[in-house]
Amino acid sequence: MLTKFHSYETGKAFTECCDCGCNLHDVDIYIINQSFAGNECIFECAMCLQCRERMNEQLSENSRVAMFDFMHDHADMKSRQERLSNNSETEAYIESCITCDKLRSEAKTFTLGAMFSGDQLIKGPFPLIICDDCEAKIAASISDETRKFWDDYIAEHFPGPPSEIDLPNKTKPILI
């Protein structure tokens, strides 16, 4: 079930940052990303916020601006906050794409993002999903430099699929 945000590989809660290896319960905030093709998890990672911010600094300025602009232009956060409260069921946050409202069940692939403090899900902008169509638009907007950085990062930290295969939308999973 998606709302548990556990590792599909181990069936257990994530415990380590995929980048620095720190214990996720020793940091203030961490993010979980899971990419799915249908109901199958094809990529997953948990990353402390410090590593996520450091990674963001490695992306080209043009890519950071393009991704920010895409989210700003397409995600209606005010409407989302009005519709969902911190007391809303987690499923309500992830039933449709944050940027186009395409139902998760209609997406061929999608990426799920969630933010945690300890074992507590932080609700607000997260949790969220981005559908295959919006992932493709984001992927088309990033620079070759950023694409190479992300492809190299996946290949280095996650040997085997998805670093060595073409996914249905011909892009690597995105990091939310």
Briefly describe each language-model feature range.
Residues 42-68, 123-150:
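Short metal-binding segments enriched for Cys and/or His
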Residues 2-5, 27, 45-47:
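N-terminal alpha-helical interaction blocks
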Residues 11-42, 62, 92-124:
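Short recognition patches in nucleic-acid-associated and regulatory proteins
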